[in-house]
Amino acid sequence: MEGWQRAFVLHGRPWSETSLLLDLFSEQHGRVRVLAKGARAKRSSLKGALQPFTPLLVRWSGRGEVKTLRSAEPVSLALPLSGTTLYCGLYVNELLSRVLQHETAFSELFFDYLNCIQTLAADPPSPEPALRRFELSMLGHLGYGVDFLHCAGSGEEIADGMTYSYREEKGFIASLVTGHRSFTGRQLRALSTREFPDADTLRAAKRFTRIALKPWLGGKPLKSSELFRQFLPRKPANAAPADEE
């Protein structure tokens, strides 16, 4: 790769006594796996810099699936996530690691990710709106296009007072039966704008993203959610990471 580009570390693990194997989310190449040789050595200039939520400029080389990190410079200090927001940030990182293919460019999603992490770092009253917006954005970039404003059965515009059932690969169908896949027209309008004025629309957004993300995640649970449940006190529903039910 020629030149520098912006990136964040999604995940890292030791590789030999002195090196790190990293998953990066880069602006121009999407998710890239790199080997940071010597990054764990005592005198390494990279020691402490290759951490999640630290904005980086990076360069790498290589043609295989695992590249060699040539240079990395922090643009600023790590964005200050702690407590609940830290676990939410780890959730977002794990989500990207699980669903993005290697070296597929998602430049717009990179900036949506940056906006999400910056919002979490500002310690909002609830992290849920930022998480729901990011999930919906990611689904859109992955090609999961859903029309929230029209009934898939009739083509008519969604009506606020009606109930609709979600069906994969089709959309929302008017229904008299309510269930886990049922949404009101008002909730669907909130999903279309990614604005959630109250707890009802926020819960509906969470329910929809759980349904939509399930095929991407399969049956394997997210480690970040398990960590949240183990190490943080129980919070109200609106304060939990995205895949908490």
Curated annotation (Swiss-Prot):
GO CC, alphabetical: bacterial nucleoid
The UniProt record lists the keyword Transcription: no
Domain of life: Bacteria
Keywords in alphabetical order: DNA damage, DNA recombination, DNA repair
Gene Ontology biological process: DNA recombination; double-strand break repair
HAMAP family on file: RecO
Role description: Involved in DNA repair and RecF pathway recombination.
Annotated family: Belongs to the RecO family.
Name listed for the protein in its UniProt record: DNA repair protein RecO
Organism (species): Erwinia tasmaniensis (strain DSM 17950 / CFBP 7177 / CIP 109463 / NCPPB 4357 / Et1/99)
Gene responsible for this protein: recO
